[in-house]
Amino acid sequence: MVLIRVLANLLILQLSYAQKSSELVVGGDECNINEHRSLVAIFNSTEFFCSGTLINQEWVVTAAHCDSTNFKMKLGVHSKKVPNEDEQTRNPKEKFFCPNKKKDDVLDKDIMLIKLDSPVSNSEHIAPLSLPSSPPSVGSVCHIMGWGSITPIEKTLPDVPYCANIKLLDDAVCQPPYPELPATSRTLCAGIPEGGKDTCGGDSGGPLICNGQFQGIVFYGAHPCGQALKPGVYTKVFDYNDWIQSIIAGNTAATCPP
């Protein structure tokens, strides 16, 4: 079974396939409190259901399938139960999606750019991660993180984000397990061929950081998480650099690559 890696309560995403419950990092360890300063928690009245990445003081990048009617974003958070003194909460002021995204197709151009209702300040636990200067190379070591499930089948949500290292794999590795993905999808394939480490339900929208650069957005994967030869699929940020920069510069009519 394959599912979008987001919480099951986002019912609008349930189309012809089963939706993947929110994903957590499976096979990882608790993140160091200072190693996820750009990680954004996206939450509603009941739970953290997605993550995002702060790319400057006013803008966050996440997955389009993380969109919801009412949500807030928390920055500088580590533990859900023990707040950091520098945590900041923001609402979305504007949300941008690829104008050429196929309607009602959650597998197409899964990226959302959010302008915050007010800028955030850099602090001990908050700092942006810039857009990538070049695309990643196969074999790169990549870092995943999130508050998603830490068990592959039953949902087990941690109080703190979990982190793990995986590798960028050749796109061909992701084609057999996910034939439903468009052939032209601008995505990355990343994981551990033998399985054991993966993003999971609740990790959707979070970053894939390869060699220190923000290269991917948690998008799609298998359920149970962490299966052998079924790595995760990530939206390829580098392919959307021009669109993101155009929107930030004020060109709201900018179009994403096909």
From Swiss-Prot:
Pfam families: Trypsin (PF00089). The active site is at H65 (charge relay system), D110 (charge relay system), S204 (charge relay system). Expressed by the venom gland. Residues 19-24 form a propeptide. It is an enzyme of class 3 (hydrolase). SMART domains: Tryp_SPc. Snake venom serine protease that may act in the hemostasis system of the prey. Belongs to the peptidase S1 family. Snake venom subfamily. This is Snake venom serine protease catroxase-2. It comes from Crotalus atrox (Western diamondback rattlesnake).
